[in-house]
C-alpha cells in the first residue's frame, strides 16, 4: 500500500491507503450521538420521555474497540438520560452532553487522556461536528451526513448513522491496527 492512490479492499468497500495510515495511529474514537449512534430521530412519549434506537452492531464495535486499547468518548449537543444508560452498558466512561461548543470537551479529553489530536478519530453527521473534525487525525462523516460535511471528511462511511456506521469505523480502526481478528467471539 505504499503507492499513492492505492487502496485496501474491505467488506465495506475499498479504503484508501491514506485513511488506513491515519487509522493505524488512532487511540481515541469520539462519537456524536444523534445521527451517528442513532438515526437522528427522537421519539417523544406522552410524559416527555425521549426514546432513541441504538444499533447493537455499533455497540459490539465499541466494545471491541475498548477491549483493543482504543478509548471511546461521546460528545453530544443534547442531553438525555438514555445516553448515560447506553454509555454505562457499553463501558464508555468519557461522556460530554449538552455541548454546544464541542471543542471545549475535545480539549478536555486530550488533556485528560494525554492524547495528541493526530491520534483521535471523530465521527459526526452535521456542521456542529466540523470544528472538532478539522482538528483530529481521522475525520469521519456518516453516509447520510449533512452535504457540506461529507466532502470535508477524510472518510465517509458506506452505512448511515444509527444503522451500523459506528461499527464500520470500529472495524476500520481494528483492521488498520491488525486487531480485527482478536475481536472474534467477544460478548457485549
From Swiss-Prot:
One Gene Ontology term of the molecular function aspect: 3-deoxy-manno-octulosonate-8-phosphatase activity
Q: Which keywords describe this protein according to UniProt?
A: Hydrolase, Lipopolysaccharide biosynthesis, Magnesium, Metal-binding
**Any Pfam family:** Hydrolase_3
Alphabetized InterPro entries for the sequence: CMP-NeuNAc_synthase, HAD-like_sf, HAD_sf, KdsC_fam
Binding locations of Mg(2+):
32, 34, 125
Q: Which cofactor does it need?
A: Mg(2+)
Domain of life (superkingdom): Bacteria
Question: What is reported when this gene is inactivated?
Answer: Not essential for growth.
Q: Which biological pathway?
A: Carbohydrate biosynthesis; 3-deoxy-D-manno-octulosonate biosynthesis; 3-deoxy-D-manno-octulosonate from D-ribulose 5-phosphate: step 3/3; Bacterial outer membrane biogenesis; lipopolysaccharide biosynthesis
Q: Which reaction does this enzyme catalyse, per its entry?
A: 3-deoxy-alpha-D-manno-2-octulosonate-8-phosphate + H2O = 3-deoxy-alpha-D-manno-oct-2-ulosonate + phosphate
Q: Name one GO cellular component term.
A: cytosol
What sort of enzyme, by top EC class, is this?
hydrolase
* Known EC number: 3.1.3.45
Biological process per Gene Ontology, one example term: lipopolysaccharide biosynthetic process
- Enumerate the residues binding substrate: 34, 55-59, 63, 78, 86, 102
Job of this protein: Catalyzes the hydrolysis of 3-deoxy-D-manno-octulosonate 8-phosphate (KDO 8-P) to 3-deoxy-D-manno-octulosonate (KDO) and inorganic phosphate.
Cite the record's note on assembly. Answer: Homotetramer.
Q: Which family does it belong to?
A: Belongs to the KdsC family.
Q: What is this protein's record name?
A: 3-deoxy-D-manno-octulosonate 8-phosphate phosphatase KdsC
| Provenance organism | Escherichia coli (strain K12)
Amino acid at each position: 500500500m505504499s503507492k499513492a492512490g492505492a487502496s485496501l479492499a474491505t467488506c465495506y468497500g475499498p479504503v484508501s491507503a491514506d485513511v488506513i495510515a491515519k487509522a493505524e495511529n488512532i487511540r481515541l474514537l469520539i462519537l456524536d450521538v444523534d445521527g451517528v449512534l442513532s438515526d437522528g430521530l427522537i421519539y417523544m412519549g406522552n410524559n416527555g420521555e425521549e426514546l432513541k434506537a441504538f444499533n447493537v452492531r455499533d455497540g459490539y464495535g465499541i466494545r471491541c474497540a475498548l477491549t483493543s486499547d482504543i478509548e471511546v468518548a461521546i460528545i453530544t449537543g443534547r442531553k438525555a438520560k438514555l445516553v448515560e444508560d447506553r454509555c454505562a452498558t457499553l463501558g464508555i466512561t468519557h461522556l460530554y452532553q449538552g455541548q454546544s461548543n464541542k471543542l471545549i470537551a475535545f480539549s478536555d479529553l486530550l488533556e485528560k487522556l494525554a492524547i495528541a489530536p493526530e491520534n483521535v478519530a471523530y465521527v459526526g453527521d452535521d456542521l456542529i461536528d466540523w470544528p472538532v473534525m478539522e482538528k483530529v487525525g481521522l475525520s469521519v462523516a456518516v453516509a447520510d451526513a449533512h452535504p457540506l460535511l461529507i466532502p470535508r471528511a477524510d472518510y465517509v462511511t458506506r452505512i448511515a448513522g444509527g444503522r451500523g456506521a459506528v461499527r464500520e469505523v470500529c472495524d476500520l480502526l481494528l483492521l488498520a491496527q491488525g486487531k480485527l481478528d482478536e475481536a472474534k467471539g467477544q460478548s457485549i
